[in-house]
């Protein structure tokens, strides 16, 4: 899970990936009461925000509530999946939804995620450049802040000599060919690399497209920990806290 923090243990916690879901129960924390409810409802999937398992276990003996939950889940064939900091850090994730619910405007990430962006460079015949760009954008490339379809394009010439066994889009076997091409540069989240490459290979007319991937040190301002924003109208601290308690249906604050 590429957006989770290093300390986290999000993802599949208990169960088989090929299990067919009969129903899903959402919760903040996995407890025995949550598992009992899932069993009573006939649901075999529990999706929690906080992971049940954070540390490694050398034995499972039921000595604490976590081990009790592990044993109960396994005994009743319940799959447990947790989406924690990967959901917190996601663009438009948990923090953005809370900010929207409490009426914040001009919302932006408090601590942007680093080492999560990649630059893609590829070279495409001029006539097919637009089709390839569209395919890359559709696969998740080209988003910078509140802008999408971002790319940089330079015209130039590419050369190649097709060998026996190849099926060149242009040029002839055994002859050096020069083709007018466009160098396309764009950015993408690193976790979308596989689907972007698949889209590139599908849209590119060459049977052996040339492309480069470069890791970037730029922070991804759309993803990260926490958000900050402004209130539409000023409030005192007490007024704000009372409104938060009511809006989020909290018992304590």
Residue ranges and their predicted role:
Residues 1-252:
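Hydrophobic structural segments
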């Amino acid at each position: 899970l590429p957006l989770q923090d290093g300390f986290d243990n999000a993802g599949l916690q208990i169960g088989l990936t090929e299990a067919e879901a009969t129903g899903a129960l959402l919760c903040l924390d996995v407890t025995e009461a949550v598992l009992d409810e899932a069993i009573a409802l006939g649901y075999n999937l529990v999706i929690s925000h906080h992971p049940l398992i954070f540390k490694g276990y050398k034995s499972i003996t039921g000595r604490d509530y976590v081990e009790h939950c592990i044993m109960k889940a396994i005994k009743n064939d319940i799959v447990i999946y947790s989406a924690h900091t990967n959901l917190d850090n996601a663009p438009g994730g948990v923090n953005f939804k809370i900010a929207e619910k409490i009426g914040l405007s001009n919302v932006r990430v408090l601590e942007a995620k680093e080492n999560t962006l990649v630059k893609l460079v590829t070279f495409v015949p001029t006539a097919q450049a637009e089709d390839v760009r569209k395919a890359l954008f559709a696969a998740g490339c080209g988003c910078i802040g509140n802008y999408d379809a971002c790319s940089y394009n330079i015209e130039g010439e590419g050369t190649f000599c097709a060998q026996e066994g190849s099926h060149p889009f242009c040029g002839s076997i055994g002859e050096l060919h020069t083709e007018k091409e466009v160098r396309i540069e764009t950015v993408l989240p690193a976790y979308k690399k596989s689907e972007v490459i698949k889209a590139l290979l599908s849209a590119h007319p060459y049977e052996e497209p040339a492309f480069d991937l470069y890791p970037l040190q730029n922070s991804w301002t759309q993803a990260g920990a926490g958000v900050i924003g402004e209130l539409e109208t000023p409030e005192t601290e007490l007024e704000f806290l009372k409104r938060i308690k009511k809006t989020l249906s909290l018992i304590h604050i």
